[in-house]
Amino acid sequence: MKVAAGNGILIFALSVFLISLWPADAAALTLSYFAEGAAGVRTNDDTTRKDGYNLLEGRFQVKGSHSPEALEDWRAELTGKAELLADGYDESLKFILREATLSFTPADIVDVKAGRQVLTWGTGDYLFINDLFPKDYVSFLTGRDDEYLKVPSDALRVSVFADAASLDIAVMPVMEPNRSVTGTRLSFYDGTRGAITGDEANRYFQKPAETIENIELAMRAYKTFGSFEGALYYFRGFYKEPRGIVDAATERFFYPRLSVYGFSLRGPVLGGIGNFEAGYYDSAEDRSGLDPMAENSSIKYLAGYTRDLGNDLSIGAQYLVEQMLDYGSYRSSLGAGEAVRDELRHLATLRVMKLMRDQTVEAIFFAFYSPSDNDAYLRPSVGYKITDNMKVTAGANIFIGTEDHTEFGQFERNDNIYARVRYSF
């Protein structure tokens, strides 16, 4: 059955937002703004569209909220966040709607939020197992603010708070994929060509049809046990990366169906905060592992620990293991010359954060290292809050690897140094 309007929730929420955002009392409308300029230069020549840089842009954001008197009994709130982006790399001017929601409380234990919104949950730091909501890794790898790692979805979210457990349900009528690396701004390893590819890549990603059967569903049930919070997760939808191949010769890819069942536990451990999370990825397109055109099922495990060492210094470490299931079937289905993935992929991360000068300076070092892939990704950054309104941030994205086909090794020629200036008012 065809969905009559794939973006119906967005259109409805935005319409209500625009109409209701004209309160009789201007004081009832809360607005905030920021203007930001960002630039990032590459340290290597490559085959991308513009070799000298991969970030040059200015953006202006408006964020507003309003509590309409007509829905006062339901504690309703309308929120919106919109941006105007002048992108020098793409040579384009874009209007971006990041948020347009109506939230209300129809009962004491129920909250509802409908419209365009950023959804997230899970316990990882830059590592996501049960968070199957869309991400923008192009922004992440080129120096944009962390806010832009999370991509908004058109969704209905219902939260129920009960003594037995609390429940979050998110329904996404239209599948929103990740913003994937395609070669335009960042080069990558193209498995169909067996080489690093840039702007010459001509990939086509086939999104699922907008039908009732393809509506995505995400659920989380969570409860506190003493000082620990435990959670169960369920997701039914699609991989957010195009991990299926329609036709390798014409570089056509699709997003395979996916169900995920997971859990997490988080609480105090040895003077810090520990977390453990796991998820079983059921790849509906290839449960046997024999189809080389679709992703195998897998299990992912994550353990993490963070601690405040005092004097405004904190550290955090994580260890992730990704286990491919039916690995023998995967190996037997490989074609001649294809890069071979490991059955177990290991990934460790380290975060060190230091605040200085009355907490106006924030220095962060974040590192990814995979002992199985023998590659790494380093993210140093320093932010300085010059005034209450102005902040300057500088950092780098550094990739290290010995093989072209590994997660971070494929990006070795994409090293970049960036700077951002933001003025909020």
Question: What are these regions, as identified by a protein language model?
Answer:
Residues 29-31, 70-76, 110-112, 164-167, ...:
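Repeated loop/turn-to-beta-strand initiation elements of outer-membrane beta-barrel proteins
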Residues 66-70, 106-108, 161-164, 224-227, ...:
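Outer-membrane beta-barrel strand-turn architecture
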Residues 65, 70-188, 226, 401:
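Outer membrane beta-barrel
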Residues 71-72, 235-237, 266-288, 292-368:
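Detector for outer-membrane/organellar transmembrane beta-barrel domains
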Residues 398, 411-425:
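Outer-membrane beta-barrel "beta-signal"
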Residues 56-62, 97-100, 152-156, 215-219, ...:
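Hydrophobic, lipid-facing positions within transmembrane beta-strands of outer-membrane proteins
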